[in-house]
Amino acid sequence: MSVRLDGDIRKLVKTLKNFENANFTAINKNIAQSLRTSTLDRFKRQESPENKKWEKRKYGNNRKKLLKNTGTLRNSIKSKADKKIATVGTNLEYASTHQFGVKNRRIKAKNSKLLKFKIGNRWVSAKEVIVNIPARPFLGISEEDKEEIKDVLDFYVKKAIEG
């Protein structure tokens, strides 16, 4: 098998050299920052990467934004990149509970004898409760994110071609 290239291949060689010298850390950093921004926007819109609205609360004030009581989860979203990978995520232990939801999870009081919480207008105390928390995914890559990644890559490819 053989490949034959006719014509002036200097531009092709130059483009390939430009790719070889490309700053992949910068490319991945650009992608990671874009993904972090869209993740934070999902908190504002209260929706998943698939643009599905998060399930409302069964109890309490439905006018309050979900996953926004203190802002800790939202503020823990970080982006990181190196020459091989772009990542967006959080290190909070409870993030997976909100991302994937839980069924029949037992919660016990840690720092006191009883848990205290409000259901409607009534305060309730219990040693432990079983909770079901619906999934409210905030991490992921949406169709819009894919387009943004494509645009970032297109920019760097054009830059390599133009030299």
Language model features: what each stretch is:
Residues 1-163:
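Short, Lys/Arg-rich flexible segments
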